[in-house]
Regions:
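Short strand-coil-strand connectors
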Residues: 3, 23-25
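A short, exposed loop/beta-hairpin motif centered on an aromatic-Gly-Thr core
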Residues: 25-36
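Short aromatic-glycine-(Arg/Gly/Cys) micro-motifs in beta-strand/loop hairpins
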Residues: 10-23
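Short, charged, surface-exposed hinge/linker loops at domain edges
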Residues: 1-10, 35, 39-74
């Protein structure tokens, strides 16, 4: 059975970047856009799992994003 790893993209309103929270050993991501986050995550997760967790046959990765912003009244 394949192990499922979890990656969450969290918006840091102070720094204005997306940052990662994850159970993938060694994974640290910080990007300006969610599209950049996803693209980088797809590359780095594979590398981090191979280098730090000995995963070479593949794994499942569940990822989510979460952010909060202030909405000004119209």
């Amino acid at each position: 059975m394949r192990k499922t790893y979890h990656v969450e993209a969290l918006w840091d309103p102070e720094a204005q970047v997306w940052v990662s929270r994850s159970d993938v050993p060694g994974l640290v991501i910080e990007t300006a856009t969610l599209a950049e986050f996803e693209a980088l995550m797809r590359v780095l997760v594979r590398e981090m799992l191979a280098d730090n967790d000995g995963v070479h046959e593949g794994a499942s990765v569940e990822w989510t994003s979460r952010g909060v912003f202030d909405l000004q009244a119209a």
